[in-house]
Structure formats: structure tokens, C-alpha cells
């Protein structure tokens, strides 16, 4: 992974004068404005959404926190989230797609939504198997066998193309095998969106929004519409990468 220069993610110091107030939304003149010291603190210690909500309940902080977070993430508009997956055993590709950050969506509150690039070569996450022997058995504890699944290795990176067309990665969001259960695949109804979480049964920080487009036995073609990443996780990864 190549090193990149940190993108500016803070409010210019010339805009912050001692004992002054910053109006983040001129149209909301009735809203109480935050002291610049609080704004500096939030800018320095993101993610701070929960902290400022509990500590300064008298201010319209949800609005201001969201504005600050969106400002910190705005530079990502130049980047793509690239997702590559392959079957662990057959080594065959399952998906290869890229997505760009879209507008904030109330439907996925707390997540940054990356919509597939219009020029993306494929939007399909394809899993297939011939019979049960193609599915891996998994025993978490002695005598406890979990539902049949397919082992898939997912690699997600946040990167952009430089002028010489080389990829400049900010960081790898995820690079681990996941177990895709057959019963979960069978439960997906065509045309109904579902979320395929990469960190199943944990915190749900990265996932694909998918719909099933093929109901043939042993074949699952999932159409990917977007990738969602927990905003707090994304900010945390960025802070670790640039410091």
C-alpha cells in the first residue's frame, strides 16, 4: 500500500477567531451556535457524535455533528471503494466492483453509502455450487456443526487513480474470509434488498446491499446496488491511517 499525503480535513484556522462563533447553517438563525472551543474539540476527536450529544444536550448538536462529519469525509468524493471477492477453495472470482460515496441517506443512518460506479464492469456478486460437497463444513465447538456455507475472501480498499493511472490506496477496509451460509442465500427473495455483512454476527460495519436475480438451484446471482460502511468505523480507520 502506497503512502499518500493527508487530505485537509479541518476547518481553516483563519475562519476560527478566539471567542467567536461559527454559523454552519445561515438559514437556521434561531439555532444556538457552538463556541469555537467545542468545534475545535469535535474536529480533533472525531468520531464524537455520542460524546457531544450527551455532554452538550442544550445545543442543536445532532445537526452540527453531522455537518462536521460530512465535512471531514467530503474529500472521499475523489475516491472509490473497491470490492474484490473470490472463492477460497476454487480461487475463482465472485465479484469485482467499485463504488463512490453518495449523499447521506436516512435509510442507512450511521452509515456512509457508496453507490456503484456507472462505468462499473459488473454489479453481480455470484456464488454457485453443484452439490453439498462443494460447501464447507464448519464445527465451532466439538459436536456442533453449523449450517453449510461457502468460504469467500473479501478484499475492500479505498483508493483513487492518480494521473499516471496507478492506484493510490488510503487503507484496506477489510481483507478477511467470510462464511456465506446457504440457508441465508435461500432466504433471499428476488427483488427484495438484503444486506450481506462482511463481519457476520459482529458489529456490522461493512456490507453489500444486494437483491437476488437468479433462483436456479445451486446458483445465486446477487445484484449489488451499493456498499455501506459504518461512518464511525470509516472515520476511525482514516484517523489511524493519517496519524
Curated annotation (Swiss-Prot):
Pathway: Protein modification; protein ubiquitination. One of its GO terms (molecular function) is ubiquitin-like ligase-substrate adaptor activity. Residues 28-73 form the F-box domain. GO terms for biological process: protein ubiquitination. Signal peptide: none annotated. It comes from the Eukaryota. Keywords: Ubl conjugation pathway. GO terms for cellular component: ubiquitin ligase complex. Probable substrate recognition component of a SCF (SKP1-CUL1-F-box protein) E3 ubiquitin-protein ligase complex that mediates the ubiquitination and subsequent proteasomal degradation of target proteins. This is F-box protein pof15. The lineage of its organism: Eukaryota, Fungi, Dikarya, Ascomycota, Taphrinomycotina.
